[in-house]
């Protein structure tokens, strides 16, 4: 794309992009940190296969959130990359890898949930923890291998122009780069989005049907929340983003609206904690207990701070009263001395 040196490839409002990144960071980071504490505690006390998958999903979200400040700096700089160039492909690789990791782990969780309900006896006899660990490794490798195209694109062809014509990061591409990137994006949309979506839809539709026939109302509500949060992730956060892959492949260039649907995909780190919450009653109980402890610590800290503040005010009042006491004492002493002199004269 031919643009002048002072023009930006991005014609939208970069502060809107910054605001979405900031909101995602402020909301997603504390929620995922709380989820991390809960999952670590659960795995130490009563390890379950689905918690291994959800712990990896939490780690993926936290990795995205930790690298999100780089994107915030880029957005605040008008979508130009002001940081060292080596951070550009790294942040892009982490960003896109974690997005597709969410889709893969959500599909794996749906399989676990379906098997635990549809085949409970067989499910209990299987060594699920080891298999969950292998599935997690496979998901990380599959997503990382596909998203390594970021490095291929950034360092392909003319290295001097690999960082975009205007100092942008993974926004502008030459024709030879698009010839590699667009087919890979299409393949990623099929393998890392459509296939997990089909698997997840099948597993949860069967799960809802089975529980609708004989499950408790409480469990039905929990599964309904899990399905709603999962479908929200797939259809709202990831759907438009992967549609941009298909449109880009057909049109032969990246759609101009791609940046906005990419923002939707980052919001998955705020939606995932709801998936965790509805994943099991055990997580809900542990989460409520953790919140209760945090609220107790907060109340204790406020009480101690209030007592310290009162003590400080009391000390200041005492120091303020001391000069007045001295003046009163000096005045009374002066009057006593004068009286004695008068008596002596008489």
UniProtKB/Swiss-Prot annotation:
<dbReference type="GO" id="GO:0007186">
    <property type="term" value="P:G protein-coupled receptor signaling pathway"/>
</dbReference>
<feature type="transmembrane region" description="Helical; Name=4">
    <location>
        <begin position="133"/>
        <end position="153"/>
    </location>
</feature>
<keyword id="KW-0812">Transmembrane</keyword>
<feature type="transmembrane region" description="Helical; Name=5">
    <location>
        <begin position="179"/>
        <end position="199"/>
    </location>
</feature>
<keyword id="KW-0297">G-protein coupled receptor</keyword>
<dbReference type="InterPro" id="IPR000276">
    <property type="entry name" value="GPCR_Rhodpsn"/>
</dbReference>
<keyword id="KW-0325">Glycoprotein</keyword>
<keyword id="KW-1133">Transmembrane helix</keyword>
<feature type="transmembrane region" description="Helical; Name=6">
    <location>
        <begin position="223"/>
        <end position="243"/>
    </location>
</feature>
<feature type="topological domain" description="Cytoplasmic">
    <location>
        <begin position="112"/>
        <end position="132"/>
    </location>
</feature>
<feature type="transmembrane region" description="Helical; Name=3">
    <location>
        <begin position="91"/>
        <end position="111"/>
    </location>
</feature>
<comment type="function">
    <text>G protein-coupled receptor that is activated by short chain fatty acids (SCFAs), such as propionate. Hence may play a role in the regulation of whole-body energy homeostasis and/or in intestinal immunity.</text>
</comment>
<feature type="topological domain" description="Cytoplasmic">
    <location>
        <begin position="280"/>
        <end position="346"/>
    </location>
</feature>
<feature type="compositionally biased region" description="Basic and acidic residues">
    <location>
        <begin position="307"/>
        <end position="330"/>
    </location>
</feature>
<dbReference type="GO" id="GO:0005886">
    <property type="term" value="C:plasma membrane"/>
</dbReference>
<feature type="transmembrane region" description="Helical; Name=2">
    <location>
        <begin position="48"/>
        <end position="68"/>
    </location>
</feature>
<dbReference type="InterPro" id="IPR017452">
    <property type="entry name" value="GPCR_Rhodpsn_7TM"/>
</dbReference>
<feature type="transmembrane region" description="Helical; Name=1">
    <location>
        <begin position="20"/>
        <end position="40"/>
    </location>
</feature>
<keyword id="KW-1003">Cell membrane</keyword>
<feature type="topological domain" description="Cytoplasmic">
    <location>
        <begin position="41"/>
        <end position="47"/>
    </location>
</feature>
<feature type="transmembrane region" description="Helical; Name=7">
    <location>
        <begin position="259"/>
        <end position="279"/>
    </location>
</feature>
<comment type="similarity">
    <text>Belongs to the G-protein coupled receptor 1 family.</text>
</comment>
<feature type="topological domain" description="Extracellular">
    <location>
        <begin position="1"/>
        <end position="19"/>
    </location>
</feature>
<feature type="region of interest" description="Disordered">
    <location>
        <begin position="307"/>
        <end position="346"/>
    </location>
</feature>
<feature type="glycosylation site" description="N-linked (GlcNAc...) asparagine">
    <location>
        <position position="166"/>
    </location>
</feature>
<dbReference type="GO" id="GO:0004930">
    <property type="term" value="F:G protein-coupled receptor activity"/>
</dbReference>
<dbReference type="InterPro" id="IPR013312">
    <property type="entry name" value="GPR40-rel_orph"/>
</dbReference>
<dbReference type="Pfam" id="PF00001">
    <property type="entry name" value="7tm_1"/>
</dbReference>
<keyword id="KW-0807">Transducer</keyword>
<feature type="topological domain" description="Extracellular">
    <location>
        <begin position="244"/>
        <end position="258"/>
    </location>
</feature>
<protein>
    <recommendedName>
        <fullName>G-protein coupled receptor 42</fullName>
    </recommendedName>
</protein>
<keyword id="KW-0472">Membrane</keyword>
<keyword id="KW-0675">Receptor</keyword>
<feature type="topological domain" description="Extracellular">
    <location>
        <begin position="69"/>
        <end position="90"/>
    </location>
</feature>
<feature type="topological domain" description="Extracellular">
    <location>
        <begin position="154"/>
        <end position="178"/>
    </location>
</feature>
<feature type="topological domain" description="Cytoplasmic">
    <location>
        <begin position="200"/>
        <end position="222"/>
    </location>
</feature>
């Amino acid at each position: 794309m031919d643009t002048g040196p002072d023009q930006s490839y991005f014609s939208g409002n970069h502060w809107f992009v910054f605001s979405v990144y900031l909101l995602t960071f402020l909301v997603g980071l504390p929620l995922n940190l709380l989820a991390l504490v809960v999952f670590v505690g659960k795995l130490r006390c009563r390890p379950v296969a689905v918690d291994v998958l959800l712990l990896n999903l939490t780690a993926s979200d936290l990795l995205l959130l930790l690298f999100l400040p780089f994107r915030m700096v880029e957005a605040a700089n008008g979508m130009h990359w002001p940081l060292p160039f080596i951070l550009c492909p790294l942040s892009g690789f982490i960003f896109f890898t974690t997005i597709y990791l969410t889709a893969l782990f959500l599909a794996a969780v749906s399989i676990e949930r379906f098997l635990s309900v549809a085949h409970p006896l067989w499910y209990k006899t299987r060594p699920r923890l080891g298999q969950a660990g292998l599935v997690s490794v496979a998901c990380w490798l599959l997503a990382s291998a596909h998203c390594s195209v970021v490095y291929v694109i950034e360092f392909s062809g003319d290295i001097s122009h690999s960082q975009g014509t205007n100092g942008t990061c993974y926004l502008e591409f030459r024709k030879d780069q698009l010839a590699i990137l667009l087919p890979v994006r299409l393949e990623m949309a099929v393998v890392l989005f459509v296939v997990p979506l089909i698997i997840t839809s099948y597993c949860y539709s069967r799960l809802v049907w089975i529980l609708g026939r004989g499950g408790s109302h409480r469990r039905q509500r929990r599964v309904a929340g899990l399905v709603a949060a999962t479908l929200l992730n797939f259809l709202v956060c990831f759907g438009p983003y992967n549609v941009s892959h298909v449109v880009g492949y057909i049109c032969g260039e990246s759609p101009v609206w791609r940046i906005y649907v990419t923002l939707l995909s980052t919001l998955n780190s705020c939606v995932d904690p709801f998936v965790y919450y509805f994943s099991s009653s055990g997580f809900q109980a542990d989460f409520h207990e953790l919140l209760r402890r945090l609220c107790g610590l907060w109340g204790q800290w406020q009480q101690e701070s209030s007592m310290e503040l009162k003590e400080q005010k009391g000390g200041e009042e005492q120091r303020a009263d001391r000069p007045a006491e001295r003046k009163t004492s000096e005045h009374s002493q002066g009057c006593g001395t004068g009286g004695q002199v008068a008596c002596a004269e008489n």
